[in-house]
């Protein structure tokens, strides 16, 4: 196995699973592997489209830690598209919220999450 690949597996605590097929990994580990694989190309932007889809709350919490780790330790921007607002609020510094393709609100996370239109569209009243 390539040294760079093995190093990324270690960073994401997947090195002990290096000989396993990705399809046999738990869902949370599959997401970590997908992120590690993307990082192997040394991108400047990491686009994550609904990464928490299908995950249970424990897996989502681990995913949040993983994304925070990437955001804080790799020199790149993370663009997150996600409906899980607890994940979004736990990671994002800035938000742009769309509803049916129209921009509802944009700004700092805490401010956006207080916006009445955002609450109605995504958080429920």
Where are these regions (language model features)?
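Glycine-rich phosphate-binding loops of nucleotide-dependent enzymes
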Residues: 1-125
